Amino acid sequence: MMTYIIEVATPAMSFWELEKVRANSLDEAKSFLVERYGKDAFFGYSKAVY
């Protein structure tokens, strides 16, 4: 399991937010954030941290 730092935003937000998510893969981390922010969420920079 790794920690991913991902920029996330939605059309309703006026700025990007950084989220820290522990997951087995980047796809799993993004799908967790889609559940949290909704399907209109989009992602910017992401980085894996051990």
Predicted regions and their residues:
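Short, mixed-charge low-complexity intrinsically disordered segments
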Residues: 35-50
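Short aromatic-glycine-(Arg/Gly/Cys) micro-motifs in beta-strand/loop hairpins
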Residues: 1-17
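N-terminal regions of proteins, emphasizing targeting and processing segments when present
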Residues: 10-12, 25, 38
